[in-house]
Amino acid sequence: MSDQPFQFDAARFINTLTKNGHNRLIGAQYHAHGDDWCELAIPYNPELVSDSATGILASGPIFTLMDMATSLSIWLKTGTIQPQATLDLRIDYLRPAKPGQTVIGHGECYHITRSIAFIRGHAHDGDPEKPIAHVAGTYFLTAS
């Protein structure tokens, strides 16, 4: 038995989550994380385009990306992996993603009560100062 305490490898864990289900289908990938935030990326994929004439990415993959990034930010903030459910996730689309660009989703958990986590975030395609979308919402911590 090792004398080293268990250390949660968030990058490895998040990378594993993006290899399954709808996150795999949209091509979500780990990008970066901190104590209360997570970034995921979706490389440009013509199969996710909503209009073949323009090459603009559909809104659904961006919503999925933001739901996953904000959800993971809660686990990072609490330091525990616990069941949770999206109560409300509002997304304001500011502009379409540029065709051919990777979309980065940044999610942050900024407050937690006994049973509710509050999140915010944004998606961009290379410049965080020119976001594609902003998100805000709440998650129910189902184990509470």
Enumerate the language-model features and the residues they cover.
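A generic structural signal for short beta-strands and their flanking turns/coil linkers
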Residues: 26, 36-38, 83-89, 101, ...
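Compact, glycine-rich, soluble single-domain proteins
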Residues: 53-71
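Catalytic strand-loop segment that frames the active site of acyl-thioester-processing enzymes
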Residues: 27-57
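Short, solvent-exposed helix-to-loop capping segments enriched in aromatics
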Residues: 10-20, 72-81
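Hydrophobic residues in beta-strands and at strand termini
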Residues: 42-44, 93, 141
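Hydrophobic beta-strand-centered segment that forms part of the acyl-chain substrate-binding groove
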Residues: 71-104, 109
